[in-house]
Amino acid sequence: MAFSYGFFNAKNLDRVYTAEDFTSYLSSLICNGILDTYGDNFLVTASGNLSVVIGTGKAWIGGHYFINDMAYTLDLRQYVDESLSRYVTIGISCDVSDSVRACKLEVKSGTAATSPSVPAFENTDTKTYLTLASVRLNGGITSISQSNIKDYRSDEKKCGYVKCILGKCKVSEILAALDSYNKTVTELNNRVAEFQERLAEV
């Protein structure tokens, strides 16, 4: 399975989760965004034709998670106009309305024009978005290049990365800080041991 999500209230047992699902949930953090320590962080890349590839990743939206555990190819040929250009925006949505209760990948199409604008996802009381990227589809295009793709993952107003509980650093940053701290402690312990050896020789 490429995608999974959770957790939502069940109706007639239509939403069932395992212990593994729950532990995966607990291993994530609170702030909305992409977990920067999992997979490819949903990187959107050109595939050489009219498709793009969504890399593996894990997102956190309002206490719900969305996982892509294998590369996912998204065909955009239906959005190509013969003569005019348009943008499409790719994102992850979390819909908590009773009729949906799910997270999924979404594409929002802009209007074809001589000077097209980038369509934006709009959050509502029941639906929240993380915008991954926008893709410019020039009129009559036969393949998408990487230069046609704009990455929004680091834009905290549109997406952003999951941060630690204090909301001041990404997971990878706090892990790097801990690694640096451990190296410093090890170095200090070595110096203390060396000093004690010298004292013993006196």
Description of each model-found segment:
Residues M1-F42:
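N-terminal alpha-helical "arm" segments
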Residues A2-R15, S51-L199:
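Beta-strand-rich solenoidal segments
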Residues L29, G33, T37-Y38, S47, ...:
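Compositionally biased, intrinsically disordered low-complexity segments
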Residues L43, N49-S51:
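Conserved P-loop NTPase/AAA+ ATPase motor core
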